[in-house]
Amino acid sequence: MLEADLVSKMLRAVLQSHKNGIVLPRLQGEYRSLTGDWIPFKQLGYPTLEAYLRSVPAVVRIEASRSGEIVCYAVACTETARIAQLVARQRTSKRKTGRQINCQMRVKKTMPFFLEGKPKATLRQPGFASDYSISKKPNPTLLREKGSTLGAKADVDMPPYPDAPVQRHVSMSANSSVTVLRSHPEASKLQFMGYSPKPHCLLLFSPKSSLPAPFQTHISRACPKEVNDNLNQTVEKPNVTPPASYTNKMDEVQNRIKEILDKHNNGIWISKLPHFYKEFYKEDLNQGVLQQFEHWPHICTVEKPCGGGQDLLLYPAKREQPLRSDQDPEKERPPPPPAPRQEVPSKGSPAVMPDVKEKVAELLGKYSSGLWASALPKAFEDMYKVKFPEDALKNLASLSDVCTINYISGNTQKAILYAKLPLPTDKILKDEAQAQGDFDIKSMIEQEYLQIEKNMAESADDFVEDITVPPLVIPTEASPSVLVVELSNTNDVVIRYVGKDYSAAQELMEDEMKEYYSRNPRVTPIQTVHVGQLLAVNAEEDAWLRAQIISTDENKIKVCYVDYGFCENIEKSKAYRLNPRFCSLSFQATKCKLAGLEILNDDPNLVKVVESLTCGKIFAVEILDKSDIPLVVLYDTSGEDDININATCLKAICDRSLEVHLQVDAMYTNVKVTNICSDGTLYCQVPCKGLNKLNDLLHKTEDYFHCKHMTSEYFISLPFCGKICLFHCKGKWLRVEITNVHSSRALDVQFLDSGNSTSVKVSELREIPPRFLQEMLAIPPQAIKCCLADLPQSIGMWTPDAVLWLRDSVLNCSDCSIKVTKVDEARGVAYVYLFTPKNFPDPHRSINRQITNADLWKHQKDVFLSAVSAAASSPGNRNASTPAPGSPAESLRKSHPEVLRKSVLDHTSSFSLEELPPPVHLSKSGEHMDVYVPVACHPGHFVIQPWQEIHKLEVLMEEMILYYSVSEERHIAVERDQVYAAKVENKWYRVLLKGILTNGLVSVYELDYGKHELVNIRKVQPLVDVFRKLPFQAVTAQLAGVKCSQWSEEASMVFRNHVEKKPLVALVQTVIEHANPWDRKVVVYLVDTSLPDTDTWIHDFMSQYLVELSKAN
């Protein structure tokens, strides 16, 4: 589907969901809330949104409201009406993929257990005002409860209402208390101006007839009075005064508009004013200003033609303005923008005396910002010492001839009164003459505007040489895609960002350039050139590209294509002046530095490797430092696994003469087994030139750190995957490579020269000193991956007994021997016979033959490797893993905090319920709380987490990663329905063991996230006391307010799209307690407050969706 057609269809869907139309300033926001994108009117070739809308009359009907606002309505389309209704109600983020080229990066996140979609400081602030527009809404009614830490609650039960705005301010401090805005004049003033204080939880309800019985009550949504603690005492709202900054900005805008009108004595259409404003002052005119002109008689005169036109005319202000002798100029306040006038006539009401109307008009003249109707009697009595007629207050419509009445939410008893301005004398004309005059004026101004546009188009060819191009903004997404163009060294890599606002926008611009330069006969090649000048170049295949002159010659010039980053010598006949219209897009070619390769950036071998692996290809990029030249890591995501390009290039330039090249049938002695994995894989160190040089460098590094004071420059300030650094273990420094960054505090590393992997704190790592860095990087990893050869096929999966026996026999033994039988270069594995010193070189007495003992391969039921000390259960059993002296694992275990080691429980049986943490705190029925939904199945079953506890859960998971990565292993029995720790995708979770399978897997339930997983039984370990303090965070929930016993897959998917991995507000209806904390259940209403001016009650949305779905079926 073409882009224009897709935009038209989505635009119709948005407009059809608003039967009263959408005002033009809000249309972009409504469109984005449905599609996730803005209306791309510029990409479609239109200078403004209004111009695009007027170009599609089959989709949009544009009218002007009574207040002068431009309102857009959908044009009926019978074939898509029903579909559009369903789409309009499903307000999820459906982002168009566009031209996507491998833009998704499966790189490990820096915070894998840090929740997605964390809310902003304030998810929603109703009434937020821009610089020039003041909120027209009165202060909402606030509900307050003393001493509440999770939310605010009134003395009566509040009903859930889908239109009621929900505010909240989330604080991550553990002991933060809730504050709620009180009834205070200054607070009211700030809230009215859009600078409202931010309470933790603030719900505003409105009456609704179809409410659940326990929540039925009637409280006005737009009541202009504050409700205090006992709901009895009320306080009137005071008038408000805009802040000084607002007044200063408004004065500047008024002066500018006055200057524009002085240049157009014959009038100007209000819809054209933003264009002239931006043309003269290089700034956008705030849309809120367009609604205030009728309140600025000293600036302009507003006239609406009666010939059926939809626009308004603005004239310069008349020299003689009505005098207001009683008005104090020092008390003048800028008026708020007028709301749509809602004149509500009252039939059968008594008329108001003319003298009262005159006094009301005179009184309102003193209040340029308007006066609340409820405050009128007191102001009237204070000024005239006469009581205001009660009938007049009940019948505000009777005052409509002397004042303008702005009703609040359609309530005839709540309104703001404004003084009416006298009409200009030249507007009192006869109908026919006025209509003809309006037509003549409109034609004249349209001709003038067309002439101005024509002159601008002609003057554009005069081309101002000093063209300013906006700088390129680095994408905000986590892993944008880039195209590598070329490089001179690894600190100077030319890239282009791939995406909608980058490469796609450039392609659209180049199409426009081709059309402009190919079809415009007035455009001719440039005659005079100078270095630095911007050009449009007619390149190969009739493409038009932006370029900048680097050097000049007689007939040729050297240019750099600013969107591609390469240079070329071209003839002058192909160079044209660049039209300013093509300078709004930033230059797309930019530079970056490859992280980890800075020290070798000029190495020709490295540059050659990087160039061969990257140039002309698209990669996902992790931006580490968003400086002028960003520091990045490139990832190739085209295959099944993500490949770290930086690390791959670094390994490709290692000194091959320092590698160990194993030969088939060769014997090697003095071999040290450094690591044995749970699948029987071994890592060995074979004596060689590289190992000797590495040991020598590590000794020099130790001496260097010993002699030199350790400063902050040697601490790791910017960890990233693939970075090689040092880790101090058992009194010596070892090389490690960062393999996964969990957070700013914890990460996973692999020992390059022993094959071990573990999790460490960032503070425990050190940078390699610069004097040794280049030599250290040149030495290849010295750990050789091996497998025992010729093992019987019947052995199958390695048992814990077999692994422990092998570790006990050869781990860290430095005088073993191996005989190589096969080398699999593709997998990087050597198949060997392994010998201890006593058995070398008899093949029948090798480790390969000894380990085939049948007793070691009996698969014991419900047995796995645990995190309990081996000596605790069987002191004399050598099958328990005891690491040899000097191993990295032993050093890590010894350095682990004593509090964790002491807390390890030596139980082979299950833990009792008394050892479980207390249940997580939930709000009571009728209260609300901030929650996060980590997983959702359907409205009848989803999981919530209390938002206030998320930070504590993140800290706990960091501690679990650090603890279990260095814990010892032993046999232990497992039982169903008991709590353990389990490793799932490189992270450790608190789990409930649900079932034990016969294939070595167990079914577990994540007690903090609510997910069910299958893991290897060896990855399950006891949950120690330290990790049993925090309550389990996952609480099963059910959506209240919907009646459906079975949910279709389609309905379940819609529900998941709206709630899963999102922060929401939950209004608790029922809490179902249970003895087991994981069996507790809560029935809640969910409210999505992420949209700027709309709260989505999920139960109402799902109910409407089911109704529409049934109609469609």
UniProtKB/Swiss-Prot annotation:
Membrane-crossing segments per the record: none
UniProt keyword annotation of Lipoprotein present:
no
Spans of biased composition, class Polar residues?
Answer: 875-884
This protein's record includes keyword Cell wall biogenesis/degradation: no
GO MF entries: mRNA binding
Give the GO biological process terms.
germ cell development; lens fiber cell differentiation; lens morphogenesis in camera-type eye; P granule organization; piRNA processing; post-transcriptional regulation of gene expression; spermatogenesis
Q: Where is this region: Interaction with CDK17?
A: 876-1113
Q: What does the tissue specificity note say?
A: Expressed in brain and testis.
Q: Which SMART domains match?
A: TUDOR
* Pfam families, alphabetized: OST-HTH, TUDOR
**Chain positions with Phosphoserine modification:** 874
Interaction with CABLES1 as annotated region, ranges: 908-1113
- Location of region: Disordered: 320-352, 873-895
Q: Which InterPro entries match?
A: LOTUS-like, OST-HTH/LOTUS_dom, SNase_OB-fold_sf, TDRD7_LOTUS_3, Tudor, Tudor_domain_containing, Tudor_TDRD7_rpt2, Tudor_TDRD7_rpt3
Tudor domain: which residues? 528-585, 718-775
Cite the HTH OST-type domain residue spans from the record.
3-76, 249-318, 352-421
Which subcellular locations apply to this protein?
Cytoplasm
One Gene Ontology cellular component term attached to this UniProt record is: cytoplasm
Q: Where is the composition biased (Basic and acidic residues)?
A: 320-334
Provide the alphabetized UniProt keywords. Answer: Cytoplasm, Differentiation, Phosphoprotein, Repeat, RNA-binding, Spermatogenesis
* Subunit description: Found in a mRNP complex, at least composed of TDRD1, TDRD6, TDRD7 and DDX4. Found in a complex containing CABLES1, CDK16 and CDK17. Interacts with CABLES1, CDK17 and PIWIL1.
Instruction: Quote the function comment for this protein.
Output: Component of specific cytoplasmic RNA granules involved in post-transcriptional regulation of specific genes: probably acts by binding to specific mRNAs and regulating their translation. Required for lens transparency during lens development, by regulating translation of genes such as CRYBB3 and HSPB1 in the developing lens. Also required during spermatogenesis.
Q: What does the sequence similarity comment in the record state about its family? A: Belongs to the TDRD7 family.
How is this protein named in the record?
Tudor domain-containing protein 7
- From what organism does this protein derive? Rattus norvegicus (Rat)
